[in-house]
Amino acid sequence: MRYLATLLLSLAVLITAGCGWHLRDTTQVPSTMKVMILDSGDPNGPLSRAVRNQLRLNGVELLDKETTRKDVPSLRLGKVSIAKDTASVFRNGQTAEYQMIMTVNATVLIPGRDIYPISAKVFRSFFDNPQMALAKDNEQDMIVKEMYDRAAEQLIRKLPSIRAADIRSDEEQTSTTTDTPATPARVSTMLGN
């Protein structure tokens, strides 16, 4: 019986490892991006803190922006916008529920390669209770903080796709240089007599 349980457990581990299954909230950051520079206009802002936390959770060593190393990829955080749209209304016409939309733009600069733009969009619903103004503000602040965390997770999850795009562009460059000869074939301009 113990042998059967061990066999089933081993089989389950092999199946989940073979299909690419991984734990939630973990991203396989490419090895070329394990050392990175985080560049932000607001280094102590909520998005910068959330991205810094996610990078550290994924084993990325962050270097200072003023570092002398120029061979390190850089994640540059750009514009953040939060919009509120009315999702539902009370009978009297007041807004009952908002849908909040956070859009984050960033770019990844790989030295000697290219600049890759990435973005993240997070949606959350927020109930607007007019009788509880203070509680409403606190709840909205908590939701916005959670949205920053989710946006940071989405940005970090896009790092492997950037690495794949970088590899793909390298392959395209090598295939175009090997397909076309460096010098055109020689053509004789002499006419026969």
UniProtKB/Swiss-Prot annotation:
Region (Disordered), start-end ranges: 166-193
Record-linked Pfam families: LptE
Lipid attachment residues per UniProt (S-diacylglycerol cysteine): 19
Topology term for the membrane: Lipid-anchor
A biological process term (GO) from this entry: Gram-negative-bacterium-type cell outer membrane assembly
This protein's UniProt keywords: Cell outer membrane, Lipoprotein, Membrane, Palmitate, Signal
Similarity field: Belongs to the LptE lipoprotein family.
NCBIfam families in the cross-refs: PRK10796.1 (NF008062)
Protein name (database record): LPS-assembly lipoprotein LptE
Originating species: Shigella flexneri
Source organism phylogeny: Bacteria, Pseudomonadati, Pseudomonadota, Gammaproteobacteria, Enterobacterales
